Design a protein with these regions (language model features):
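Metal-dependent nuclease catalytic cores that hydrolyze phosphodiester bonds in DNA/RNA
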Residues: 1-136
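Mg2+/Mn2+-dependent nuclease catalytic core
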Residues: 122-168
Length: 168
């Protein structure tokens, strides 16, 4: 991968140690500790719409968040298989669905993006560090589209959240 393009505020590194604690994750490199972007954003104010949603769903919120995380992991795994050239279908050889229809739809949104923009895949699961922002993290994919470098983190939400741009 051409690392020079990423070095504006990010540096790609394979020389690091990931430290996962019960409520946070840090990356250690060259004697310096970087909090994960996800951990930093967990302290970012969620806003009025999130608060309204919590009031509306009440105790169900834990279940909803857990299911969304599980669904996101399933879609992420499907995308990785797709990027590795694996072929799979919604129906198995007996005509029975192999995937939940909502998970399949989320996966197809990625396929539509991939086919429409025709990116050149450079790397997956890239560990990035920013001395300027003092954070680190792992992006899902680095690719090139129309001669521009893209850092991609797969999302399965139906809405754009205010923290998405902060994660990049």
């Amino acid at each position: 991968m051409n690392n020079k393009k990423l070095k504006r505020i990010l540096e790609v590194s394979d020389d690091y140690k990931q430290i996962t604690l019960p409520d946070s994750r840090y990356y250690q490199r060259n004697g310096k500790y970087y909090p994960s972007v996800t951990h930093v954003l967990s302290h970012y104010p969620k806003g009025k719409y999130f608060e309204d949603w919590l009031k509306k769903v009440g105790y169900s919120s834990e279940y909803i968040v857990k299911k969304a995380s599980e669904d996101g992991t399933k879609v992420h795994n499907m995308i990785e298989l797709y990027l590795n050239g694996e072929e799979f279908h919604f129906l198995n050889e007996k005509g029975i669905p192999q995937y939940d229809i909502e998970i399949w739809k989320m996966f197809l949104r990625f396929v539509e993006f991939w086919e429409e923009y025709e990116p050149t895949l450079l790397e997956t699961e890239v560990h990035l560090f920013s001395d300027k922002l003092e954070v680190a993290g792992t992006c899902d994919m680095v690719c090139e589209i129309n001669n521009q470098l893209w850092i991609v983190d797969f999302k399965t939400s139906n809405h754009i959240h205010s923290t998405y741009d902060l994660q990049a």
